[in-house]
Amino acid sequence: MEKSMWRHPQKMIIFPIFPIAAIWTSLPDSDYVYMCENSTIYGTKFHKRPDSKGKILINDISSCFLSEPMNVSDYDMLFGGIQKNLGPAGLVIAIIRKDLISETVLPGTPTMLRYKTHADKGSMYNTPPTYNIYIVGKVIKWIQSLGGLDKMKKINESKAALLYDYLDKSDMFCGLADKDSRSLMNITFRTGSEALDSAFVKAAGENGIISIKGHRAIGGIRANLYNAMPIEGVQHLVQFMEAFEKSEGQYE
């Protein structure tokens, strides 16, 4: 089945590739370009900074922050939730050029939603969620103990390669994302049959592999390989996929 033709039962088109810079367009009167570097739904990722044609470039890094090194100066603003790789839900990260922090805001903008409010108060305008911040500190020290972001990237590449290599040779499972757009964090795939996808998800759950079902918007199967996932977890998944394929979907 051609990946570009995959559709959810509700007729939602699935995008296996991020658009290349050559086909990007921007409105001449636009103030900025917004991008989401890593798509958890489709399992795709921008692997290099797109050309924003001189516009301010804002990057949502919620699902890939601290998974690999990045040059923050390539962007005018980076932001995202931290709940994928950095700590528990309830905190956000925002890295913004100082000259973009303005006194001028849209009328009616609440004080708490103004970047200047938090910049002026050192991110402590109100009582911060101290326990969440404590956990973030622990996670950062853990990443440093492994060897920092360069080492973290190598670990994540090794984990993803295990699964992608199997998908590339499998006769039953097929990866969704094109090779040049593949995510290290979220790997999406299918069997080509919704019934077989469901059977796989059910059997996986019975064998200690949970939350493997694809996003509700597109269905299928998805493996989330965030920093905290050990390589042994990916090895277990691949071994189970091999057994499931050999059983032709009749795994017991």
Labelled PLM ranges:
Residues 4-9, 35, 57-61, 78-81, ...:
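General beta-strand structural signal in soluble alpha/beta enzymes
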Residues 12-65:
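Active-site phosphate-binding strand-loop segment of PLP-dependent enzymes
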Residues 77, 82-164, 178, 247-248:
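Active-site C-terminal subdomain of aminotransferase-like
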Residues 172-176, 208-214:
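A short linear hydrophobic-aromatic micro-motif
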Residues 173-204:
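Conserved PLP-binding catalytic core of the aspartate aminotransferase-like
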Residues 198-207, 236-242:
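Short amphipathic alpha-helices in soluble, non-transmembrane regions
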Residues 215, 219-252:
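PLP-dependent enzyme catalytic core of the Aspartate aminotransferase-like
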